[in-house]
Structures are given as C-alpha cells and as structure tokens.
Amino acid sequence: IDIAVTELDALANIDFESRQVKENFRRLNLVRLGTSGAIQQDIEVGEVVFSRTSLGFDGLLSYYEGRDAVCDLELERAFVEHTAWYDKLPAPYFVDADEELFDLFKDSVREGITIAAPGFYAPQGRWVRLRPHDMHLNEKIESFRFGERRITNFEMEGSALQGLARLMGHRAATICTIIAQRVAKDACTDYKPFVRRMIEMALDKLSTL
C-alpha cells in the first residue's frame, strides 16, 4: 500500500525532470473497494460497509513523521485498555476516512470502524495449527464500544491507505462488501454479484465529484 500511495502521489506532485515537489499541489481521491468479514451479529452478508475509521494492526503509520497528528489518540487509548493490548504487537492506530467522501456515500452504506489486519490467520483470530497469542482478542474487539461507536469488520489495507493519504493531504476511503459473517459463521461463496453492485454504486457516486 505505501508503494502504491507514494507512487500515485509522486505522479501527481513531483516534477520528474527536476526531482522537486511541484508548486501546485494536486489532491487525489483514493478509494479502496474490497471484501470483508463482519464481526457484529447484525451485519449481514451482502451489505456494504464504509470504514468511517480504520484501525491499523500493521504498525505502518508509526514509521512516518506526523502519525499522531492524523490519528484519534483518545480512541486508541480506550481500545488498548479494553483489549489489554499485548505490548509486543505493533501499536494500533485509528485514522478517519475523508469526510467529503463519507458524505458522498453515507446514504448507501453502513458505517463503522474497520480493522486492517496484517495477516489472514492469527491477526484476525483464525488458526489452523498455530494459535493466536490472545485467543479472546476477537471477543474483546466485538465488545468494544466508544460512545455509540463499535468495530464492525475486518479487512487488510484500509488503515495504511487512509493514514498515508491524510499525511500527504489526499482524500481516501475504504468501502467493502461483507462476504462473511464471522460471529454467525456464515459465508457467501457466490459473492461476485454483491461486489459488482458495490463497484457500480461507487463509480456512480465518484463520477459526481
């Protein structure tokens, strides 16, 4: 993700002949469309979730200057306390999607806090032979509340996209079709029609910008 975002930013804002930043900044709209698993009982397979806030388990943003300026530190502290976060894991970070993009989509989607996990198995509470360090982390995630806000789903890229975009001054958002209900242990194998519908909806919305 950092390669893709950095190269897109460079194409828009770097003069490749002089290797200098261009005088006139060009702001990009970066929207990830993907699939996701729900971790709240009331979210059904086939629904579309807009990641109003992305929760990064990957640690990527902490390598960049200005990380705290674009993250919700109060939400971070509450989550770390609630989960008794294992201190050998990267520090989790919460970064919001662009508000203008949210306003564009809010009438057609659910909103929530979405985890961006750095792996498919243990980081999302799954295992085959190698067990996660905290076997109860998903239960803590499911029960976490911050006012009326809650964590709704898992995916794997959104926090890096939204965090880097905010640091660079771009607009970004993550929108996912739910193809698995992790609590109810339900999954959709024929999810392409749901994804196609999401893509068509997103393109229609983005064409109005």
Show which residues each predicted segment covers.
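His/Asp/Glu-rich mid-to-C-terminal helical/loop segments that flank catalytic regions of hydrolases
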Residues: R182-L209
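Metabolite-binding pocket within alpha/beta catalytic cores that recognizes anionic/polar moieties
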Residues: I1-Y93
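Active-site rim beta-loop-alpha module in soluble metabolic enzymes
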Residues: L73-F146
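Glycine-rich beta-alpha junction loops
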Residues: G37, I115-A122, A160, I179-Q181
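Zn-dependent metallopeptidase/amidohydrolase metal-coordination segment
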Residues: S159-Y191
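Polyanion-binding loop/helix "lid" in catalytic or ligand-binding cores
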Residues: L89-D96, I151-A160
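Non-transmembrane, aqueous-exposed alpha-helical and coiled segments at domain scale
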Residues: T6, D15-L28, F144-F146, R150-I151, ...
